[in-house]
Structures are given as C-alpha cells and as structure tokens.
A protein has these predicted regions:
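FIC/Doc superfamily catalytic core
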Residues: 1-194
C-alpha cells in the first residue's frame, strides 16, 4: 500500500466527509445533529486521542446540545447493555487511546488485520459511550479520520441500520464477528488520486 501525503489525506477527507456523514446519520435512523456544519470539520491529527473525539462531538452538536463535547456525568445504557460508568470514562478512554497509540494508530496494517483492529477499537469506544447522546456519529467520524491516516477509507453507504445495531450489540457481548463482517464491507484502501 502506497502511503498518502498529508495533502492527499486532506483532499480525501474533504471528498468523503459530506457523503459519509449522511450515510452515518442513516445508521442512527436519522437521529444525527441538525446543524453539524460538516464542511468545516477538518481532518484531525494522525495521532488522535480522547480530546479529539470530544472536539468532533463538540463541532457536530454545539448548536443543539448543552455540554457538547463534554464527557457525560451520569450512567446510561441501551436496553440491557450498560455503558462505561461515567466516573471511569476519562481513565478508560485514555487507556484505550494509549492502546491505539501502541498499535501505531493502525498504520501499516493489511486490510484484514486493519478490519479486525478497527472493529475491536470501535466496539471498545462504543462501550465507553463518552457522551450523553450523539456517540455513534462522532465515533464514526473519529474512525473515518483514523482510517484515512492509516491509508484506508470507510464508506457507510449501504449498511443496514438494524444490522449495524445488532453487530454493535453482539460486540458488547464479546462477539466481534458481525462487526468484522460490516467493517470488511466498509473499509477500502485509500487511492492516491484522492
């Protein structure tokens, strides 16, 4: 895989962000931010961390959510699945980001290994669920940017929202098989012509 320059990565992000954002919101069954101003969201750093995820969330929801980009201060769950206890979000989130850093932000991996690792980290950050709402869209943008820096693109178009929800539910129970299948469809190698 040929490594992209920073300029090529930025152009690729500019080409992908709007279309991908719309498809990402469909996975939330239309529950995305009302005024995200996605065109103004720059490609983040090649070494993102929890503060960058917070920045993405703040950018997306600043016009409609008090405390956008701030870590939640109450426990939440989805059905029977509890997310990380709010008092541990920062600690666990920073540990996850340190692990991602140890994995070199997934740079240099072949597609199959990249797919496995991004599924793992997506599931872990999903279980962290650092914000009161808007986690899914913010996470997907975070991982879209991570993928670009690693030489891949993510394309959420054509992913069924119910399949996505079921895959995330299975991941929460420790089975990443369905997430791996979806990410195998979503991930493709970034092209130099971007």
């Amino acid at each position: 895989m040929k490594k992209l320059t920073d300029k090529q990565k930025s152009r690729l992000w500019e080409q992908q962000r709007s279309v991908n954002f719309q498809a990402s919101c469909l996975l939330e069954k239309g529950k995305g931010p009302a005024e995200p101003d996605i065109e103004m969201l720059e490609l983040g750093p090649s070494a993102p961390g929890l503060p960058h995820l917070c920045l993405i969330h703040r950018h997306l929801f600043r016009n409609e959510m008090k405390g956008a980009g701030e870590l939640r201060t109450a426990d939440i769950s989805k059905g029977d699945i509890p997310f990380c206890h709010f008092e541990y979000i920062e600690k666990v989130g920073n540990e996850l980001m340190a692990s991602l850093e140890s994995d070199k932000y997934l740079v240099g991996l072949q597609k199959e290994e990249f797919t496995d690792r991004i599924s793992h980290y997506y599931c872990e950050i999903n279980m962290l669920h650092p914000f009161m709402s808007g986690n899914g869209v913010a996470q997907r943008i975070f991982f879209e940017q991570l993928a670009i820096h690693a030489g891949y693109v993510l394309n959420w178009q054509g992913i069924d929202p119910d399949d996505w929800a079921a895959a995330n539910q299975s991941g929460a129970m420790g089975d990443l098989t369905a997430l791996n299948v979806i990410f195998a469809k979503v991930v493709s190698e970034a092209r130099e012509s971007a």
